[in-house]
From Swiss-Prot:
Purpose of the protein: Mce3R represses the transcription of mce3 operon and down-regulates its own expression, but does not affect the transcription of mce1, mce2 and mce4 operons.
Pfam families according to UniProt: TetR_N
Induction of expression: Negatively autoregulated.
Domain of life: Bacteria
SUPFAM superfamilies linked: Homeodomain-like
Gene: mce3R
A GO biological-process term: lipid catabolic process
Xref: Gene3D superfamilies: Homeodomain-like (1.10.10.60), Tetracycline Repressor, domain 2 (1.10.357.10)
Protein name, UniProt field: Transcriptional repressor Mce3R
UniProt keyword Repressor, yes or no: yes
Organism encoding this protein: Mycobacterium tuberculosis (strain ATCC 25618 / H37Rv)
HTH tetR-type domain location: 13-73, 217-277
Keyword tags: DNA-binding, Lipid degradation, Lipid metabolism, Repeat, Repressor, Transcription, Transcription regulation
Length: 406
């Protein structure tokens, strides 16, 4: 009896993309440090050996995912025939394509904001170079839209545009397609066209270092500062208590007189930011009765804390998933309550703004504030808090033609 020939199983042409897609999903869901190559291979339905044909290691997968997302932004600036570099165009001409890139790559944005520190030095440098190129392109477009802005003012407005677009990667909120595009367009243009609030002279060198040394008045504060700095730089899973103690200048068991574990330090950091945010919310509501003044006060409070404690803000953005369930859930619940106050005030000031639209605008404004606070060189100017507040208010009230320019 003749044997029946078995059909030849051919390797899918897009296997490399399938592997990358599965890796992206796992990195976003669990965090880079918690995903193993075996997990990615299993999710993609391939063997580990097959995965290695396409990617050398987990870092190579992460680098490719981040590059893919950033390339979508860079390719949004169109080339005309014969060009090797795109000619800058006013923001209103490029914005439709930038919004399309933001929507298409929203799942990838979180990777370059949260996970890029796990790349090797060469890949991290490439990520920073591409981010700088993206923002520089937006700055050129802003200057063509609003001539005569200073370098500092134009760069902040470019970051406002960039953060508004990339804020989509920090949440799962959405709107119907055209409504979302219109909201993003109005918010970006409102920020770009916001007149300068004040001059931005450079701060004296060394001020920040002196301020930091002055506030570390106790073992507790020193350990919190060291923990926040290390968690931000290396990621919570990669840091141990010995490193925190060393970073704080505290040897051996001295750390445990203040904290029982690394987990306790992270939880204390998240609780602290939560309580500070709540206090600023209370202050803004007590000090003001009018909706416009209340919203301005809320924004100014958020800016103040973000500039005062950038490491703390960074930890809340990148390490929240590692906090204990009780602390994480409490933080998210309180954050939702605080943002509901912002949304209610936006609705009073701009009645045409729906609750769903308000949520997206609040997410965009907060993303901008926290992105700037975590970008050192942008914060080294006197008056930058007022400038950030004015731009955030422009985003929040963009449905009303910049009602609350500060």
């Amino acid at each position: 009896m003749a044997s029946v020939a078995q059909p030849v199983r051919r390797r899918p042409k897009d296997r490399k993309k399938q592997i990358l897609d599965q890796a992206v999903g796992l990195f976003i869901e669990r965090g880079f440090h918690s995903v193993k190559l075996e997990d990615i291979a299993e999710a993609a339905g391939v063997t580990a050996r097959a995965l290695y044909r396409h990617y050398d290691n987990k870092q190579a997968l992460l680098a490719e995912a981040i590059r893919t997302g950033q390339d979508q932004y860079q390719s949004a600036r169109r080339l005309t025939e014969g060009e090797t570099e795109p000619t800058p165009r006013p923001l209103n001409a490029d914005l439709e394509d930038l919004i399309a890139a933001a929507v298409a790559s929203r799942a990838l944005t979180v990777l370059w904001q949260r996970e890029a520190r796990y790349l090797n030095e060469d890949d991290r440098t490439a990520v920073r170079r591409r981010i700088n190129a993206i923002v520089a392109g937006m700055r050129d477009s802003v200057l063509l839209e609003v001539p005569d802005l200073s370098p500092q003012h134009s760069e902040l407005r470019a970051w406002a545009v960039s953060s508004t677009l990339t804020s989509l990667g920090r949440h799962s909120l959405s709107l119907p397609g055209e409504e979302l595009k219109k909201l993003l367009y109005q918010a970006c243009m409102a920020a770009a066209r916001t007149p300068p609030v004040c001059e931005l002279p450079p701060l004296p060198a060394g001020d920040a270092a002196r301020d930091e040394a002055d506030v570390l008045f106790s073992r507790y504060e020193t350990l919190l500062a060291a923990g926040a700095r290390l968690f931000r730089a290396q990621g919570y899973p990669a840091v141990n208590t010995s490193e925190i103690g060393k970073g704080a200048g505290i040897a051996g068991p001295g750390l445990y007189r203040s904290f029982s574990s690394k987990q306790a330090i992270l939880d204390a950091l998240i609780r602290r930011l939560d309580e500070w945010r709540c206090l600023e919310c209370i202050r803004a509501l007590r000090a003001n009765q009018q909706a416009a003044q209340r919203l301005r006060g809320l924004v100014q409070g958020h800016v103040r804390i973000s500039l005062d404690a950038p490491d703390l803000v960074a930890v809340s953005v990148t390490e929240l998933s590692h906090a204990s369930v009780e602390v994480r859930d409490g933080y998210l619940r309180n954050q939702g309550d605080r943002e509901a106050v912002w949304i209610d005030l936006i609705g009073k000031l701009v009645p045409a703004t729906s609750v769903a639209q308000g949520r997206l605008l609040v997410a965009a404004a907060i993303s901008f504030i926290e992105d700037v606070a975590r970008t050192w060189h942008l914060t080294r100017y006197a008056g930058v808090a007022d400038e950030i507040s004015g731009l955030a208010l422009a985003i929040l009230t963009s449905g009303a033609g910049n009602l609350l320019r500060a």
